[in-house]
Structure formats: structure tokens, C-alpha cells
């Protein structure tokens, strides 16, 4: 797995939010974006996930230019995101929230059960609360749920 960002520029109308960043992430690496408020960290992640349009430059994943690939197809390629601010479905149960993470992997019940077991091993508190509405969890538990949901898609990049 290799994620490569080449001279990425992203605009919000006439405002250039990302001004020519380049990054390479190889399999097994952990990379952190650090910067002041408004520096473009969230915009960068949204652009990698396909939620923001690339103005110029390129995003390559395993050698394939995915700059114009829609967000839902990027999930199929193995790119997932645990959204900022937890971003869970508050009216859905913990289990239903987790199931949403594997939505693109239809008809794979055995894999889903295996993945649920893995998530519950990582976050035992989620198993205890599997039938509880996500919105009733504490802030930390909601973050666990958001990460667990992202992991349910079996991402190559999170």
C-alpha cells in the first residue's frame, strides 16, 4: 500500500485552502498532520477521502490516480476515515453504527462477524453497549465507535 499526494491544491471558492502539499505514506507507517487552526489538516483528509475536490495536483493510491474517484468508490479501494467530532449516527445502536462501516461489503456475513469480534476485542466497552443508542455514549465511547465503524470497512488507509 502506498498513498502519495503530489503538489495538492484545494479551493473553497476563491480561497486556496491547500497550497501545494506533497506527502508519501507507505504501508505500516503512521503519519500525523499537525498545524494551527485553519492550516488545512481537515481539508487534506477530506480531499484524500473524496469529500473535497482536488483543484490541482494528484492523489495516488497504490499507483492509481484517485483524484477524481468518488468518495464511495475510495472506500472500496481501502480508504476510510473516522470523522472529526466523532460523527456517529446518534439514533442508531452501537451495532447498527458498526454495520454501517461494512455497508459496501455486501453479502459477507462471516467476514462481518469476524470484524465485529475484532472491534469488540479492541473496544470491549462497545460490545457491552451494542444495543444502546450511539448518542447516549460518552464522548470517548463515541470516538471508539467512530473508529470502530471506520475499521469495519477493512481499510488499507485510515
Region locations from a protein language model:
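Glycine-rich phosphate-binding loops of nucleotide-dependent enzymes
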Residues: 1-158
